[in-house]
UniProtKB/Swiss-Prot annotation:
Family label: Belongs to the acetyltransferase family.
EC number(s) reported in the record: 2.3.1.-
Transmembrane segments: none
GO molecular function: acyltransferase activity, transferring groups other than amino-acyl groups
Domain N-acetyltransferase residue range list: 2-171
Protein name as annotated: Uncharacterized N-acetyltransferase YuaI
Keyword Protein biosynthesis in record: no
Species: Bacillus subtilis (strain 168)
Gene name per UniProt: yuaI
Entry keywords, A to Z: Acyltransferase, Transferase
UniProt key word Transferase: yes
Length: 173
């Protein structure tokens, strides 16, 4: 059983751990292992402490252990027709494909709608094996960009849902 709730300050340590561990498992064939191994929990904790937790949700198990999170808010780049953004969604590898990602996405869609947003956009590294998670909910492919991390040039794709209400309905089926 998964519970999705708003993140609290006490969750930051767990969020940072999920963030680092998920990067290591998700991107191990995409980003150099030396870079991934250099990621540390304390730095991620500090980054999370400096941010607002508005629009951040955690997934926890029946014992209250946090194993995933997602972060949503206003779009950060200019993408015509989109006003909301999924900034990040990460789950520990052993808890993926069990419905928590869908539950986090549904909670975020609800949050964005309640705050006056009507659409949602997300950037995804094209080589990310979890891109199929997003594709399962029929987004439009609306942008492409390239960036470099640890000396590796990567392509990211911008996926969007122009009708957030329709996405919420799909997620809540």
């Amino acid at each position: 059983m998964v519970t999705v709730r708003e993140a609290k300050l006490e969750d930051i340590k767990d969020i940072a751990k999920v963030h680092v561990d998920s990067w290591r498992t998700t991107y191990h064939e995409i980003i150099p292992i030396d870079y991934l191994n250099s990621l540390n929990y304390k730095e991620f904790e500090d980054k999370w402490k400096s941010r607002s937790l508005k629009g951040v949700f955690v997934a926890q198990d029946e014992k209250g252990s946090v194993f995933g999170f997602a972060s949503f808010g206003p779009i950060r780049s200019e993408q015509e027709g989109y006003d909301g953004e999924l900034y990040a969604i990460y789950l520990l590898e052993e808890r993926q494909r069990q419905g928590a990602g869908r539950a986090l996405l549904a909670k975020g869609a609800e949050f964005l709608l309640q705050h006056g947003f009507s659409s949602m956009f997300v950037w995804v590294i094209e080589q990310n094996p979890s891109i199929i998670f997003y594709q399962a909910y029929s987004p439009e492919r609306v942008a492409e960009d390239n960036f470099e991390i640890a000396g590796v040039r990567l392509k990211e794709v911008g996926l969007g849902w122009p009708d957030l209400s329709a996405l919420k309905t799909l997620l809540n089926r």
